[in-house]
C-alpha cells in the first residue's frame, strides 16, 4: 500500500470535458513521481474565503511514474469548492494529500470486469482501464456509463476509440433523458447491468466477472444490490466507490 503524504500540486493544464466538467491536470511541484494505484483518489486543500476545506477527487489518469495526475471536476452551482477549482488557471498551486482509497484493481489481472459509472464516477475506471492496457493484460473490460443528456458524456471519444481498437473492450452509454436523435441505450444504468453482465460472462468464459461501481450513493447501492442478489456475483467480486 502506497502511503498518503502531503505535497504541493501545480496546475499545468485545463480542458473542458462537458459544459459542467473540466479536467484539471496537476503535477507535484517538487518534481517527484506521484505514486498511486489505479482507482485511488487525492484530497485537495482549497483556500476558500471562509477557511480551508478539503475536497476528494478520484484520479482519472493511470499511474505512469511521472509527477502528473488528472482530475475531473464537476462545477456545482453554489458549490464553493468546485467553483473555485473551475476558476483556476495553469500555474496555480494547491496543497494536496494522497493517494487514498481501496477501490483498486490489479492492472495485470486477467479477470473480466464490468465497470458501471455515472458522471465523474467514470474517472477511476478510466484509470483502471488505461493501467490494464499499459500492463498488457488480456482482460475483458466492459464499461457501462450513464448520464442524463448526451452533452454530459465525458471521455466519450477516447473510450469509443479504445473499444474500437480491442475486441476485449466494450463501451456502452445509456441516457436517462436522451433527446429524439439519441439512438443508444436509454434509462438508468441498473436497467442494463443484468444483460451486459451475462453477456460478459459468456464472452469471457468466466461465470463470475468482477463488477466495479462508481458514482452517486443511490446508484451504487442499487447496482450493488442487483449484482449480489439477482446476478449472484460473489461478494469479493463487487467493488464500490460512493460519491456524496
Swiss-Prot record:
CDD domains: FNR_like. Residues 4-106 form the FAD-binding FR-type domain. Belongs to the ferredoxin--NADP reductase type 1 family. One of its GO terms (molecular function) is nucleotide binding. Its EC number is 1.18.1.2. InterPro entries: Cbr1-like_FAD-bd_dom (IPR008333), FAD-bd_FR_type (IPR017927), Flavoprot_Pyr_Nucl_cyt_Rdtase (IPR001709), FNR_nucleotide-bd (IPR039261), MRET (IPR050415), OxRdtase_FAD/NAD-bd (IPR001433), Riboflavin_synthase-like_b-brl (IPR017938). Transports electrons between NADPH and ferredoxin. Can transfer electrons to ferredoxins Fdx2 and Fdx8. Prefers NADPH to NADH. This is Ferredoxin--NADP reductase B. FAD binds at residues 55-58, 120. Its cofactor is FAD. The keyword NADP applies. PANTHER family: NADH OXIDOREDUCTASE HCR, PROTEIN RFBI. The keyword Nucleotide-binding applies. Pfam families: FAD_binding_6 (PF00970), NAD_binding_1 (PF00175). PROSITE patterns: FAD_FR. Keywords: FAD, Flavoprotein, NADP, Nucleotide-binding, Oxidoreductase. It catalyses: 2 reduced [4Fe-4S]-[ferredoxin] + NADP(+) + H(+) = 2 oxidized [4Fe-4S]-[ferredoxin] + NADPH. It comes from Sorangium cellulosum (strain So ce56).
